[in-house]
Amino acid sequence: MRVSGAGVTQLAPQDAEFVYSESSRHRSNIVVVYLFDTSAEAAPLTEPEAIAWMRARLGHAGMFTRRLRRVPLDLDLPYWAPDPRMNLRDHVHVSPAEAPGWDPLRRQISRIADAPIDLTRPPWELHFITGVTTRERGLRRDPISAGDPDRMTAAVLKFHHSAGDGIATRDLGRRLFGPDTSHPPVPTRPRDWSTATAVTRALASLPVQCLRFRRGLAAAGAADERIRAEVADGTIVEPALSRPSCRFNRPISAELTFDLVILPGDQIRAAQAAADGATVNDVMLATISGALRTYLSEQDESPDGSLAAMVPMSLRGTGKGVADGPEGPRATHLALMAVDLHTDIGDPVDRLRAIGASTRLEKQRSRNEHVRRSARRIESSPALLLRLAGRAKAFKDHSGPTVERYNTMISNVPWAGDDLLLRSAPLVRTFGILEILDGSGLRHLIVSSRGDGVAVSFSTDAAMMPDTDRYRDLLRDSLRDLAEPAHEVGI
């Protein structure tokens, strides 16, 4: 992200890609939900109180007070610029829970998560849902969450992916809800955004952009040659370019839904012991693999070959993102791995071992200097090319028998911490919701849970998976199948 004036910064190509890909069938929303125990509060949070609470915290992220500004004809990458008309009433909302129980809460949060973000304003929203209870069903059935409070408030933070990735979300949540009562000041509004200045600068930089693009293509081409050589000699292993398609790889309908399961830590550790050397992430991938395999089998839709997952790997540390401050050069720091889920292997422990081996190979490939250099070709791509690539996604055919590289997404975000508070209300649980899109109608997010367990949320198309309860049960059963061999031998 290049600085072009006080308070005005230009998006990095990796972040601008989310702007250019935005459509009704390809949203780039990031959503995280925090549940707080408000059973000791005398009265629920009101909207004026919520607005005052948020006003004190606006200095924690540039996106809270800045909006996207696109250059006419996309002659250059978009900019973040201060929004002089920013009104907190457009961003902070308070509403009561529509009904007791987990299912009504899911529906209420799903509507919030799937609604488009207004990119003519700072691209974020914060919704508070008061009077939440999970008493009737759902989470109460999980032993680890059997002690949920009788009254909670859900804080639903939503923002555009161009402003940050999953790790940035975790860090921002810690700043907003952390115990520190001191908050940075809101930046003073600098000079106004000038479209004419941006166009003039873009036209003047066109020769430099063309030269940078040529050099980027040459560097990426050289890196691709080295990759082919290292694949040939076995130094790295390329993942399969195509996978058999399944119901979750079709165009999505209009209804997003999600669900959540809490998986017990003792079973995760037992599964690790059953396959010596397996990591927690390996166990989670194998758990999802087993559930997906069984779910498709029950629909009489077992694929001809193994399915694979897109697994983002964080590259944090290469630069600061928007959530860290307005001067950061990049908001998104991710490499996208394609991990074989080995859904064609019947034995659960054998499948876990195979997934562990595939994950290690993909991590090795993704960290390879030539692979990373090849991926950096986007850094020199002109804005117009990124825009055309983004628009092309809307016309992609998803009716074929195969898909490119992966069938589902499995992401992992570390636990935000035990000391988060909403006013004086302590945190009970946090989970995220990943946006679905055409060709990717089932996505999973793993969050280390408070206490001894791991929370797995999954978002899907209600038409593709009308029975999320069944998939939740299959996730539990899949982990139990992985843990049983260790219990049988007394590990």
Predicted regions and their residues:
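Basic/hydrophobic alpha-helical interface regions
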Residues: 18-19
